[in-house]
Amino acid sequence: MASHDVLMAELYMARTCKWGILRVVGGDVWNHSGDVLITPANNRLSGREGLDAQIHGKAGEELTQVTRNICLEMRKINAPPCAVTHNVVTEPFALSSNFKHIIHVVGPDCRRPNQDEARRELLPQTYDNLFETLAEMKDVSTVIS
């Protein structure tokens, strides 16, 4: 593979949906830029694993502090920091050269086959909430996830 091939993204799918055209491409997320970077988050917004941990690491301590403050404020009212199916928008901090916003999306954990089927039924609501958030953001045309 030539060195320039590493940076190329492969188009897997393009579909029209009620929100516009959705293109699914593959490749290293760090070789892309866009208006929004979407991260799969846990309900504490802690950036503990996977892509979310990488994003927190690259965005810097400011992002960790902001998400920690969101958690503290929600605990004051006895609410989860970010409930399943919901999302939170933050600044990109150290990733601002590539993105305008980060959206932390809390979806249901469906990794184990013996989990309650009701969790899987939360996935459509998670995506609907994400697309509603994106529709409310006036400066978004490219989303990286």
Per-region residue spans from a language model:
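Macrodomain-like recognition of ADP-ribose-binding/processing modules
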Residues: 1-145
